[in-house]
A protein has these predicted regions:
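A generic structural signal for short beta-strands and their flanking turns/coil linkers
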Residues: 4-8, 36, 49, 54-58, ...
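HotDog/MaoC-like acyl-thioester-processing domains
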Residues: 3-4, 62, 67-68, 79-131
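Preference for bulky hydrophobic residues occupying beta-strand positions
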Residues: 8-12, 30, 60, 76, ...
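Short histidine-centered beta-strand/loop micro-motifs
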Residues: 19-22, 64-65, 70
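Hot-dog-fold acyl-thioester-processing enzymes
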Residues: 2-57, 111-131
Length: 131
């Protein structure tokens, strides 16, 4: 498994399951969002809902299905930082085995314009320390 600096567990809910008994493909993006929320809380010490981050990119590659009774974890890392962008790479695991790989890019939006704003220096420090 690749080296990821953060990991969190997610619960498979009944509503996540499709007619084939697998976690629905769209739910994987929800698991990524839950991992981002946990990362912001645990690493950056801020609630994701209190930031002006906007998801601008999502890439998701499925490797194997997740079943209703699987233990699911999401590992993530920040490969590099942009001026205002925060890319994240993920591995969703079911019972320790890769179920999907993903990448997202969040941008810190400037609420006073249609543009972006630089990532806070405190975020940069915490992210670099976590690597």
């Amino acid at each position: 498994m690749a080296d990821y600096s953060y990991e969190t567990t997610v619960d498979v809910r009944l509503r996540d399951i499709d007619f084939m008994g697998h976690v629905n493909n769209a739910t994987y993006a929800t698991y990524l969002e839950q991992a981002r929320e946990a990362y912001f809380r645990d690493v950056l010490d801020v609630s994701l809902t209190e930031t002006n981050t906007v998801l601008v990119s999502l890439e998701l590659e499925y490797a194997s299905p997740i079943e209703a009774d699987d233990a699911v974890t999401v590992a993530l890392r920040v490969p590099e930082l942009g001026d205002s962008s925060l890319p994240m790479e993920y591995e969703i695991r079911a019972n320790g085995e890769r179920a999907a790989m993903a990448r997202t890019v969040q941008v810190l939006a400037d609420p006073d314009s249609d543009g972006s704003q630089p990532l806070p220096s405190e975020w940069r420090r915490r992210i670099e320390r976590r690597k």
